[in-house]
């Protein structure tokens, strides 16, 4: 959106001029937004709301379910109109964090409540310049699906899946050479899969900027070697050619259709799309590691706008929604993982699996302690910087320029943007 900085400047001015009125737990209504939970989880959400309202007689919670495709724009419009939700599950956090429109959870959440949360999620998606602005909710941790039949057809041992990224690429090349299928179903688009900055982090190259964010560190031989590895894999057709511009769920379809032999994913919910024939071929295992030694994780988060007149009550409801018991119950209903310590340690995640989906979820759950949250750098203007990284990396993948040329251009463009901060 071209006028986004202007809109947020207006918001900052409006917030400073119209402070929220004092709160009281007497006849207030909290507006609560979720993303695409209305169809499958209405009973779960409504039960939580009813329980909370019963314990807080003066509070009512108005639940609004928003589609994923429109939530960021709808949230922005609500801020501009000075009528935001009190508690919201949103995407595109960097867009909002840099403009100081969200309440600090470090300020409103007591230390004993923070301690209940897994630290990688508390200091994850909403951690910006030393402060956390989100309440972590449900999460996902990557594991790997692979196709037994394609492994066997390529002469690979189906009982010995790859343990590292390099092994995954090597097996992917063998599969491509011997079967004509792609080795790995992987999306490289920043809004869908693992973008270039996450690829660098997986292999141990981090941070991307110096301590005072005055210049980038990305133009490094280490970064060049990591990105070259991916360019080589793309050119060797280990990855499908559509990986750069993949649409939502394309990577899942490539795997299920037998076009690709391996699919890094998060748990077992995709088994709903497996037929009996494919169930016999699909095997779950741990996510292959890069040099970092950790696996990627993501999590859904809740935010409270500063403009809410009910910040404290919204935070209280958010903590109730995301407590151990409620997160564990959510995980029993869906192939997701919790973001609290007690829930993550529950025997439910380590029980004997009853299905293929359970097997996959167990691999994800066992790697919660070995995960890092795929949070982008906490720097102003990151959205534009990420676009630059994607554009230049895409040109390198397409052999329109070398990796070194891409890094030179990224460095120049990023440092130019940093000079204005």
State the predicted function of each range.
Residues 91-143, 169, 195-200, 279-283, ...:
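Hinge/lid segment of periplasmic solute-binding proteins
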Residues 133-137, 142, 167-216, 260:
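Extracytoplasmic/periplasmic solute-binding protein
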Residues 283, 333-391, 395, 420:
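Long, aromatic- and glycine/proline-rich binding clefts that accommodate carbohydrate-like moieties
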Residues 106-119, 161, 186, 204-225, ...:
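Short, solvent-exposed loop/beta-turn-alpha elements that line the ligand-binding surface or hinge
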Residues 51-120, 127, 153-155, 160-163, ...:
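Extracytoplasmic "Venus flytrap"/periplasmic binding protein-like
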Residues 145-147, 297-310:
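A bilobed periplasmic-binding-protein/Venus flytrap-type ligand-binding module shared by bacterial periplasmic
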Residues 26-39, 59-64, 86-87, 133:
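Short, well-ordered beta-strand elements
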Residues 171-174, 212-244, 274:
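Glycine-centered hinge/linker elements that transmit conformational signals in sensory
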